[in-house]
Amino acid sequence: MRTLNVDLGERSYPIYIGENLLGDAQWFAPHIVGRRVAVISNETVAPLYLETLLGALEGREVTRVVLPDGEAYKQWETLQSIFDALLQDRHDRKTTLIALGGGVIGDMAGFAAACYQRGVNFIQVPTTLLSQVDSSVGGKTGINHPLGKNMIGAFYQPQAVVIDTASLKTLPARELSAGLAEVIKYGFICDEPFITWLEEHMDALLALEPAAVTEAIERSCAAKARVVGADERESGVRATLNLGHTFGHAIETQQGYGVWLHGEAVGAGTVMALEMSHRLGWLSAAERDRGIRLLRRAGLPVVPPADMTAEDFMEHMAVDKKVLDGRLRLVLLQGLGNAVVTGDFPREILDATLRTDYRALADQLGDE
């Protein structure tokens, strides 16, 4: 078992990483202040892991809230059903919410915790690779709006993050690949040696070899903890964590939430960020191609949806949290391992990026 710390002063909290942590009370008890707990999960995860978690909560009064599964349900009506359950069972300010599931559950349970009686404690128990390495750490919570992803929410930190790597054994291959998009991101934005490590261990990660998986999760969480500790509310360096996300969120919104998994959209969006960085002269063709090959080896799409036009992208990218004073800012790379957030680029470079033939680009790289 490994422990990391997100250093935010009095709001600091631990990240526990290990196998079979879910049923062990020692990882939960120090972070629960009252006797009332509400576990928020979904119809896919609850049958697999809820009873195990309840074993760690023995002796407490537990409300179970099981929601529909999927990005399409990350919206106001579902959030309201969490509040309904809390109020019906008379939960008070000493209640602790526990988010048992992937990124959708973590985001919604965290937002519910931020809002309920103006704030109650919550614990993240992420069960997908994507949520383990990204969304469970850092306090971003919220829901989607039909016009834009994650546009309604709050920064609200958990009391702890409990990562049980055993939960990945039931994760579909497509979800595993989606999570690897966020793992790869950390190498691209701030840790070039991690890219080399991922190239050497990608087969082991796809096979869920425990040592490789634990190492990838720990390095990813450590990178995110450093960034969040330096910039909790995304006023500066934290925005670099959104590499590929502006393009990716446009894909998710245009295609319909849940049609593309978040990590899949980020994968294709990262290819677009690599291409734009290359067009600006910040990334060599060899570096761009190296990045695309790694994403493809992870089983991720490296071509945006064929039915999305440049105009579609621009329409959806205009509704993005990184737009300031009407100016679109993007996360781009000035070399692998060095991300920047900038709105200082020629419009024609962005337009050319959106009109690139990514199918031809992928085909010219050949098969692995």
From Swiss-Prot:
Q: Subcellular localization, per the record?
A: Cytoplasm
- Name the UniProt record assigns to this protein: 3-dehydroquinate synthase
- Main localization, broad class: cytoplasm
Which keywords fit this entry according to its UniProt record? Amino-acid biosynthesis, Aromatic amino acid biosynthesis, Cobalt, Cytoplasm, Lyase, Metal-binding, NAD, Nucleotide-binding, Zinc
State which gene encodes it.
aroB
Q: Which GO terms describe its cellular component?
A: cytoplasm
- Report the top EC class in one word: lyase
| Short name of one Pfam family | DHQS_C
- Which species is this UniProt entry from? Pseudomonas paraeruginosa (strain DSM 24068 / PA7)
